[in-house]
Structures are given as structure tokens and as C-alpha cells.
Amino acid sequence: MIIFGVDPGFGILGYGVLSVSGNSFQHVSHGTIQTEKQQNIALRLKVLYEELSNVIDNFKPSEIAMEKLFFSRNITTAISVGEARGIVLLLAAQRNIPVFEYTPHEIKKAVTGSGKASKKDVQQMIKILLNLKELPKPDDAADGLAIAWCHCAVRNITRRFS
């Protein structure tokens, strides 16, 4: 089973791909999709849609995990992240891929054991948990992996108690 984790963003969208077999999670890929600030909003959304569509079609995930939108003091940022989330949800719906959402607190707790962990702590734990040679970079891609890991961990716990 392939799990696709998404850290939604308008300027930079991070993703992480894990393969799940039983209780084992293996790193497959991670990366980012970036848009240019100078481009108009419609063109940036088109770039996100087309590039993310290609990535999803390449990895063919069974499930998508995404960070929940949390209240932001910067309303413009919250709106643009919401637009990026809409693209993820649309692509998933078009492919009949279920989407699961997690708060930043849930993700940090699943990866590090603490819901108050720093980004650096999350990166370091993802490196250890997935036996990566280097810290996953950039932060957005590391967050995508952390979101995928969180979903895998929740799936395993849920499966055990079913």
C-alpha cells in the first residue's frame, strides 16, 4: 500500500511517499511543488493542479494524508493554503482516493511523542524512523513525510483494535 502525505501550501507544497507492508513503513520519495510569486493566482493554482496530478499518478497512492488547516493570524496565508488543500481534495476525489486529515499536534505527537516538538525534532525523527542517510529537506517535504508517517501509525493502531 502506498501512503501519500501532503503539507499543503500555495508557494510550496510538500509531499512524502511511504510504502506500507504490515507494520513496516518504507520511504519511497519526497519532494516539493513550487509556484512563482510573480504569477497570477489562477496560473499558480493550475501549476499546483498539473504537477500534483502528475506526482499522484506516478505513485498511485492508496490513501492520502494531509495536514488540517488550522487558524492562522494571517488570513491571506490561510486562504491560499485552503486553495491548495482544495486542489488536493479535488485530485483525490477524481481518483477515488480517500483523504485523512491530521492536526499539526497529532502529527508531531505521532512522530516524536510530543505534540509540541520543533520542526527540527520532527525532521530528525523522520530521518531515524525511515533510516534516511540525511535529514529530509526542505522542511515542506519533511512535513509531507511526517504526515504520511502519522497516518501509517494511526492506521496500524486502528487495525490492531478492529
UniProtKB/Swiss-Prot annotation:
The keyword Hydrolase applies. Binds 2 Mg(2+) ion per subunit. It is found in: Cytoplasm. The keyword DNA damage applies. One of its GO terms (cellular component) is cytoplasm. One of its GO terms (molecular function) is crossover junction DNA endonuclease activity. The active site is at D7, E67, D140. Its cofactor is Mg(2+). It catalyses: Endonucleolytic cleavage at a junction such as a reciprocal single-stranded crossover between two homologous DNA duplexes (Holliday junction). Mg(2+) 2 binds at E67. Keywords: Cytoplasm, DNA damage, DNA recombination, DNA repair, DNA-binding, Endonuclease, Hydrolase, Magnesium, Metal-binding, Nuclease. The RuvA-RuvB-RuvC complex processes Holliday junction (HJ) DNA during genetic recombination and DNA repair. Endonuclease that resolves HJ intermediates. Cleaves cruciform DNA by making single-stranded nicks across the HJ at symmetrical positions within the homologous arms, yielding a 5'-phosphate and a 3'-hydroxyl group; requires a central core of homology in the junction. The consensus cleavage sequence is 5'-(A/T)TT(C/G)-3'. Cleavage occurs on the 3'-side of the TT dinucleotide at the point of strand exchange. NCBIfam families: PRK00039.2-1, ruvC. Belongs to the RuvC family. This is Crossover junction endodeoxyribonuclease RuvC. It comes from Pseudothermotoga lettingae (strain ATCC BAA-301 / DSM 14385 / NBRC 107922 / TMO) (Thermotoga lettingae). The gene is ruvC.
